From Swiss-Prot:
Sequence intervals crossing the membrane: none
Disruption phenotype: Cells lacking this gene in the mucoid strain FRD1 are phenotypically non-mucoid, i.e. non-alginate producing, and secrete dialyzable oligouronic acids of various lengths that are mainly mannuronic acid dimers resulting from alginate lyase (AlgL) degradation of polymannuronic acid. Disruption of algX in the non-mucoid strain PAO1 does not visibly alter the phenotype of the parent.
UniProt EC number: 2.3.1.-
Compartment annotation: Periplasm
Region (CBM domain): 348-474
Family affiliation: Belongs to the AlgX family.
InterPro entries reported for this sequence: ALGX/ALGJ_SGNH-like (IPR031811), AlgX_C (IPR031798), AlgX_C_sf (IPR038639), AlgX_N (IPR034655)
Name used for this protein in its record: Alginate biosynthesis protein AlgX
Effect in UniProt of substituting residue 269 to A: Produces a non-acetylated alginate. Loss of in vitro acetylesterase activity
GO biological process: alginic acid biosynthetic process; single-species biofilm formation
Segments of this protein annotated with the region SGNH hydrolase-like domain: 27-347
Gene source species: Pseudomonas aeruginosa (strain ATCC 15692 / DSM 22644 / CIP 104116 / JCM 14847 / LMG 12228 / 1C / PRS 101 / PAO1)
Purpose of the protein: Plays two roles in the biosynthesis of the exopolysaccharide alginate: protects alginate from degradation as the polymer traverses the periplasm, and also plays a role in its O-acetylation. Acetylation of alginate causes the cells in the biofilm to adhere better to lung epithelium, form microcolonies, and resist the effects of the host immune system and/or antibiotics. Displays a low acetylesterase activity in vitro using a pseudosubstrate, 3-carboxyumbelliferyl acetate. Probably has acetyltransferase activity in vivo.
Superkingdom assignment: Bacteria
């Protein structure tokens, strides 16, 4: 009974605070709300057990620990001390960088620092004592060095570590950086951009960023804590910004001179408009940025969608900025199997050895058959598949080989991106698959198949550079 009364008191205080916040916003929409609410209280004991994070959504927060002033941290991601990828992951990443370089594109990776590295002062004394900050810092910097050894331009964010700024880099209870964190990051990234070959030739203009009100955030960590423990948290308010060319408001030329930006940005929701990362990049670099970031698409969806687009192939950027967090797996083989052939636009404009258009029926559909026994060596060929309905975001297919071996491959696209229903991927090029001779391609119809769905599938030879790299990488 005592516990319940205490919780009701906290909720009442929170409700009163929110009412005061609403009144403040009504009086001045651009002002930060002023209210007083009691802290939400400590997390419940269940939050300490990984087994309680038993859904795909909750698994992202394994596991939450209480910090100061309603701050929450995740032990798995925020307090990690290991970074980077496997030896195979580094090889694949280097190969992708080389392919982009061959196309005249310099790759810049924005490898976000963790909350533990930047905001460890917010940890409770016990959690701070248990977090090996020096090891995390050492390994993060070693990973930055590995990116650079792979020929990838990679900013060093260590000047932001252990910050004691008035405006925090991260939100109290959310995995995103605040606009202030985005601004500090963009300033460092812009200094790296200025070192990239070809940057000097990119047209420049002056940009300015202005505060345009407030951004409210009821954080993802706080929402997860509410599911696990029933805790309630106050909404956090921070400054919101927008960036535009100097004089654009007066001239009406809000989008510049109409030229194509020569720097493209792909990445996560951290690069979305709410945090103005792209705008701050424009301000500090003086260059137009084409922002292709996707919210909810992981580290790869926006890059794959951009590489599938007509824009990428007709107007390739001189510099490609790829932003993602440290917890993403850079060794995902399925990602590189798609990204590598997309550099040259799959089978578009290339001679195909097999091609067919089929109206799908329920179940499995044989779409391509190597009936002439053509010498289609798996390690040297690419498949290019396009659904007639772009709303289909999953490809389930089986690739059969002459000796009876088969590969069942499932590729899922984020519903946050539009790739026109197109899927491009390399056939298997592992050492024990590369010499297999292709026999057929079967596609399983989507469960909720649109009426009259058709698929166009082609097989073509990979670019010589790709074929040689796949062999060299083994």
């Amino acid at each position: 009974m005592k516990t319940r009364t205490s919780r009701l008191f906290r909720l009442s205080a929170l409700a009163a605070g929110l009412c005061l916040a609403q009144a403040a916003l009504a009086a001045d929409p651009g002002a930060a709300p002023s209210y007083q609410a009691l802290p939400a209280g400590n997390l419940c004991p269940a939050a300490a057990y990984d087994s309680r994070y038993n859904t795909k959504y909750l698994g992202f927060f394994t596991h939450l620990v209480q910090a100061q002033d309603d701050w929450l941290f995740r032990t798995t991601y925020d307090l990690r001390t290991d970074f980077g990828t496997s030896a195979e992951g580094w090889r694949e990443l280097r190969a992708l960088r080389d392919e982009l370089k061959r196309k005249g594109i310099e790759l810049v990776v924005v490898y976000q620092p963790t909350r533990g590295l930047v905001n460890r002062e917010k940890l409770s004394p016990a959690e701070k004592a248990g977090f090996d900050y020096e090891l995390a810092k050492k390994n993060y910097l070693a990973t930055i060095a590995r990116f650079r050894q792979a020929g990838i331009w990679t900013p060093d964010f260590s000047p932001l570590f252990d910050e004691k700024e008035e405006h925090a880099y991260y939100f109290k209870g959310d995995h995103h950086w605040t606009p202030h964190g985005a601004r500090r990051s963009a300033k460092i990234v812009a200094e790296t951009l200025k070192q990239v070959p070809g940057f000097e030739e990119i047209p420049k203009k002056q940009f300015e960023s202005k505060r345009v009100g407030l951004l409210s955030k009821l954080g993802t960590f706080h929402k997860a804590a509410a599911q696990l423990c029933g805790n309630s948290y106050a909404t956090q308010y921070v400054d919101r910004f927008e960036t535009e060319p100097v004089g654009a408001s007066d001239s009406g030329d809000l989008f510049g001179d109409g030229g194509n930006p020569q720097i493209a940005l792909v990445g996560t929701s951290n690069s979305g408009p709410a945090y103005n990362f792209a705008g701050f990049l424009e301000e500090f670099s003086g260059a137009d940025i084409l922002n292709n970031a996707v919210s909810g698409g992981g580290f790869d969806s926006s890059l794959l969608a951009y590489m599938t687009s007509e824009e990428f192939h007709k107007n390739p950027p001189k510099i490609l900025i790829w932003e993602f967090a440290t917890h993403y797996d850079m060794a995902q083989k399925s990602f590189y199997r798609q990204a590598m052939p997309l550099v040259d636009n799959g089978c578009s404009g290339r001679k195909t050895v097999l091609s067919r258009k089929v109206k799908l029926r329920q179940g499995r559909n044989e779409v391509l058959l190597n009936s002439a026994a053509l010498p289609i060596r798996s390690g040297s060929y690419v498949a290019d598949v396009t659904y007639s309905d772009p709303s289909v975001h999953e490809l389930k297919n089986t690739i059969w080989y002459m000796n009876g071996r088969r590969e069942q491959l499932k590729i899922e696209q984020s519903k946050a991106v539009d790739t026109g229903g197109r899927y491009v991927f390399q056939l298997r090029n592992d050492s024990d698959w590369a010499d297999q001779q292709f026999l057929s391609l079967e596609i399983e119809a989507p469960e909720d198949m649109p009426q009259g769905l058709e698929v166009q599938a082609s097989i073509c030879q990979a670019a010589p550079a790709k074929a040689s790299q796949s062999v060299a990488g083994r």
